[in-house]
């Protein structure tokens, strides 16, 4: 996990709690596309033969011996190489065999209910980009301020609420959590009596944050090495089941493309 969980001794931890100009992190500075991260996808798509791009379908089964993928309309596609970037726990669903099911069940992760909220006015917090809320009495653990990042004139933010991997998040749960969220934002002083919710949307991240341990990491590596022999590769933050940045994912994809092109 490298820089995401760097080694730190007690003095370093205490020092990082202070207003210290020398305190830095792996993402202290960064470059970001002017038109958003979607511009990467658009550039790649524009360079492809669009007749070979199939959208609006879902893979439901993979035959790794005969190198075929079955789609949700019953059609089958023969492949030379198969590169997966979808979450590994979902990807394992496409294979038949107890070993795939066992690995799937062993994977640990959480789900996150995300609210995107738009209000009629700014908050008193005008410089913060995100905050962690270490309070069990509050239903969310992290919030972020889109408006402060974009220098907008109305409060817009995201809220993250954690769940276990086996938890079922119903519509009723979403409504309850939205009500609690607004109450807690008010209690924390982030919104006031004059602040009104104008727009909101909901996203359920499943999985959200993967949990890495020695045993499952070993089994994942064995799966990846075995399936590489069948020309199947699984990469990306969720496909490789790891912690990484967008840059890491892009480099991994570039390295794999160069490797396969050289074969």
Tell where the protein language model's regions lie, with residue ranges.
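Active-site/ligand-binding neighborhood in enzyme catalytic cores
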Residues: 1-67, 85
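General small-molecule cofactor/ligand-binding pocket signal
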Residues: 54-56, 198-201, 233
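Mid-domain catalytic core of redox enzymes
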Residues: 57-175, 180-190, 217-226
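A short coil-to-beta-strand element that immediately follows conserved catalytic motifs
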Residues: 112, 192-204
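Short FAD-binding loop at a beta-strand-to-alpha-helix junction that anchors the flavin cofactor
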Residues: 158, 223-242
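Active-site-proximal substrate-binding core of FAD-dependent oxidoreductases
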Residues: 204, 261-263
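Charged, often glycine-rich, active-site loop that binds/positions anionic groups
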Residues: 208-219
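A conserved FAD-binding loop/helix module that cradles the flavin
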Residues: 238-260
